[in-house]
Amino acid sequence: MPVITLPDGSQRHYDHPVSPMDVALDIGPGLAKATIAGRVNGELVDASDLIENDATLAIITAKDEEGLEIIRHSCAHLLGHAIKQLWPHTKMAIGPVVDNGFYYDVDLDRTLTQEDVEALEKRMHELAEKNYDVIKKKVSWHDARETFVKRGETYKVAILDENIAHDDKPGLYHHEEYVDMCRGPHVPNMRFCHHFKLMKTAGAYWRGDSNNKMLQRIYGTAWADKKALNAYLQRLEEAAKRDHRKIGKQLDLYHMQEEAPGMVFWHNDGWTIFRELEVFVRSKLKEYQYQEVKGPFMMGRVLWEKTGHWDNYKDAMFTTSSENREYCIKPMNCPGHVQIFNQGLKSYRDLPLRMAEFGSCHRNEPSGALHGLMRVRGFTQDDAHIFCTEEQIRDEVNACIRMVYDMYSTFGFEKIVVKLSTRPDKRIGSDEMWDRAEADLAVALEENNIPFEYQLGEGAFYGPKIEFTLYDCLDRAWQCGTVQLDFSLPSRLSASYVGEDNERKVPVMIHRAILGSMERFIGILTEEFAGFFPTWLAPVQVVVMNITDSQSEYVNELTQKLQNAGIRVKADLRNEKIGFKIREHTLRRVPYMLVCGDKEVEAGKVAVRTRRGKDLGSLDVNDVIEKLQQEIRSRSLQQLEE
């Protein structure tokens, strides 16, 4: 009979099989009331599943990450329950958990309107408030199939026929009269599923195949309590205000159009931000001793066949042909950098060789996945490749890590999650080589006092990697930086150097990206700063305004002086009220507005206002210029007097 070992090491002995709920009740009624599921010997199970042998058990509640995921999954079933009550002929497809919520794909003979979604959410609340028990039954494959055939659930029957073995025992979850099929676990009672909201609908092909029927996908979010739900909805509201597509249009930064899907038309102000970002990256390349190179954006298919990209990546590559030769527009820069490395004989004394490029890359992303600057087809990578010996890996990775944190801190990103991906089952190279490579990456992180987690088996076949994911002000994750070891590509492309022993050796290649796609990073910054770019990045840093025509000459002189000082400045001499001008440039997020009236002209000063509405008073022109230059030069995130 089972001996149950709890997380604190204590044990409970039973003379009969028990469920996680039984054990929770044994511990106390409070825990039993909070119990959502159990983790038995490391595996999630339903609260009602019986434990027959000795086992470790952790009780899962809404405070656990797994508990929240189970709540979300059960809310998908709740959605199914509600939609079948409102529209009984609906056929249910799949309803998985996604980030922050869930969705369900349904086959319905009507297009859901906003009113329909509201009615559906209302019915879900009515059902959840009944606090009914969710009953799980393990049945044979044949019984499960018969159940769904009788109910006309053709998609569930297809899942059974195509994805579930005949000797398996599927779990059927009964929500009163509604039955769904799932591996589980699910909540034992609907009292856990009160805090949700349906968000939107979209089209989705069955099994993601455009040859199949288009279904309707209903998205929802669910949380453990009302406070968490409201906080999430507030974050979404704030995110909508910060949407880089909306701000990009408002500030006239860029546009996209149907004739070039996923390609950016940069306007003057947006391109100014892009170039300033390039200047910043170049300054860091110089500081960390990189060469900057430029490779062709298109190379022959033969080269991509050698690298292995053609076999594994051709669907994402744009191709063209000329004079009976096929060419590929590059999706990445690395093969071109190896070609540059291969020019001329290299010695161990030439290593490490650090090569960087603002590479113009193109990938044939599905049109439905394109999203403003965040997901494009044409983009600029800020990546670099370091050619080094095995002995130099640790020092080079160390320098890459320092560079990553150095650059991210400039933009105020402080929360960075780091993951180390280790060897997959299918890989090249010896175990000894992988042992050393993984150890080098881990030690480099440890030497920089950076906490990290392992992603076992998630490395590429050609080497382990470090991933850097930064979190923005809304706590959204953006995976940008990568340090990837590569033991394959240099060999495939015949890269070599002469070692100390006078023998030819293959260099290790380190792929290093920090911002990733420049376009995407500008999108991230636009949302992070809500368009209030720090002064050094702002397209227009200062606007000088007159109150009446009598100050026009002074405004022009001051504008020229600011330009000569290297400040991006515009003069606004329009015959408009000063309040109108200030409001307009505030909406354009211009960091500083310098107002010139008769008093300022007479005193040789200028009245300074910030875009946040702060009046800094009347200041000496030279002092203002000096302070602005210092703010810009230091790439400060703070404005004057903040």
From Swiss-Prot:
EC number: 6.1.1.3
Alphabetized CDD domains for the sequence: TGS_ThrRS (cd01667), ThrRS_anticodon (cd00860), ThrRS_core (cd00771)
Annotated positions binding Zn(2+): 334, 385, 511
Cofactor note: Binds 1 zinc ion per subunit.
GO CC, alphabetical: cytosol
Enzyme class: ligase
SMART domains associated with the record: tRNA_SAD (SM00863)
A GO term, aspect molecular function: ATP binding
UniProt KW keywords: Aminoacyl-tRNA synthetase, ATP-binding, Cytoplasm, Ligase, Metal-binding, Nucleotide-binding, Protein biosynthesis, RNA-binding, tRNA-binding, Zinc
SUPFAM superfamilies membership: Class II aaRS ABD-related, Class II aaRS and biotin synthetases, TGS-like, ThrRS/AlaRS common domain
Residues annotated as domain TGS: 1-61
Domain of life, source organism: Bacteria
GO biological process terms, semicolon-separated: threonyl-tRNA aminoacylation
Region Catalytic, residue ranges: 243-534
Compartmental location: Cytoplasm
Pfam families for this protein: HGTP_anticodon (PF03129), TGS (PF02824), tRNA-synt_2b (PF00587), tRNA_SAD (PF07973)
Swiss-Prot/TrEMBL catalytic activity: tRNA(Thr) + L-threonine + ATP = L-threonyl-tRNA(Thr) + AMP + diphosphate + H(+)
Gene3D superfamilies to which the protein is assigned, alphabetical: 3.10.20.30, 3.30.54.20, Anticodon-binding domain (3.40.50.800), Bira Bifunctional Protein, Domain 2 (3.30.930.10), Threonyl-trna Synthetase, Chain A, domain 2 (3.30.980.10)
Cofactor(s) this protein cannot do without: Zn(2+)
Quaternary structure note: Homodimer.
Family indicated by similarity: Belongs to the class-II aminoacyl-tRNA synthetase family.
Cross-referenced HAMAP family: Thr_tRNA_synth
Function: Catalyzes the attachment of threonine to tRNA(Thr) in a two-step reaction: L-threonine is first activated by ATP to form Thr-AMP and then transferred to the acceptor end of tRNA(Thr). Also edits incorrectly charged L-seryl-tRNA(Thr).
NCBIfam families, per database record: thrS
Protein known as: Threonine--tRNA ligase
